[in-house]
């Protein structure tokens, strides 16, 4: 956790500007997410500055948006104007919520930057209702163009904590291998390929 907190705390103030380049992809993602969260209780992990939460909250019943970085959460709170949206600092590996608390869990662009992402998925599964939906869009860096690979190299030099490099196919397989049925997926065009995945718990 210390590695991620250090990097994200340091870059919290510039995060929104950094993400502007992917605005079109994110707008497309919001359109995919809104129908899924309509009138639902939602938990978002790795919310960052709350970009996704703020763009979908009008559709949801309530969103608890969390991040491991206190500085990111501070940035997220600055312009929050919705009573249905609450931000807090949480560890996605040790969530304080009861079993089956949420209709939808969103973890966007986070599983590739944490060690042992399969453990995060286990904790998500615990907090998600049995008939709930996991929304897990993730940059699939292994499909980078040459330009993307160069960009990723310099991001790594800057301290970006990339732990998993998946292709879209490898990422979806990873989700399935960890107990999820992928009911919908799409690859969105962004600075790095962005694989949108909508999942349900796999019946045992």
Question: What residue ranges belong to the model's regions?
Answer:
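A short acidic, Gly/Pro-enriched loop at the edge of an enzyme's catalytic core
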Residues: 93-104
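Class I SAM-dependent methyltransferase SAM/SAH-binding core
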Residues: 43, 47-94
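Class I S-adenosylmethionine-dependent transferase superfamily signal
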Residues: 33, 56, 124
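C-terminal lobe and adjacent flexible extensions of AdoMet/dcAdoMet transferase-like proteins
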Residues: 197-204
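C-terminal alpha-helical "lid/dimerization" subdomain adjacent to the S-adenosyl-L-methionine
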Residues: 2, 18-22, 135-178, 183-193
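Conserved class I S-adenosyl-L-methionine
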Residues: 1-37, 51, 75, 79, ...
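A short SAM/SAH-binding and catalytic strip from SAM-dependent methyltransferases
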Residues: 104-116
């Amino acid at each position: 956790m210390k590695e991620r907190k250090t990097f994200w705390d340091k870059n919290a103030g510039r995060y929104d500007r950094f993400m502007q380049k992917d605005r079109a992809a994110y707008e497309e993602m919001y359109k995919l997410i809104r129908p899924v969260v309509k009138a639902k209780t939602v938990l978002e992990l790795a919310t960052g500055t709350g970009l996704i939460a703020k763009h979908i909250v009008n559709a949801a019943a309530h969103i608890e948006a969390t991040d491991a970085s206190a500085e990111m959460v501070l940035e997220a709170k600055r312009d929050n104007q919705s009573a249905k949206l609450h931000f807090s600092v949480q560890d996605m590996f040790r969530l304080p919520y009861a079993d089956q608390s949420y209709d939808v869990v969103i973890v966007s662009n986070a599983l590739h930057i944490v060690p042992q992402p399969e453990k995060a998925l286990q904790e998500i599964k615990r907090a998600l209702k049995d008939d709930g939906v996991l929304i897990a869009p993730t940059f699939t860096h292994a499909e980078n163009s040459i330009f993307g690979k160069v960009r990723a190299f310099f991001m790594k030099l800057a301290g970006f904590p990339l732990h998993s490099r998946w292709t879209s196919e490898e990422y979806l397989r990873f989700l399935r291998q960890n107990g999820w049925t992928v009911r919908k997926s799409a690859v969105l065009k962004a600075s790095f390929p962005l694989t949108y995945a909508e999942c349900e718990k796999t019946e045992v």
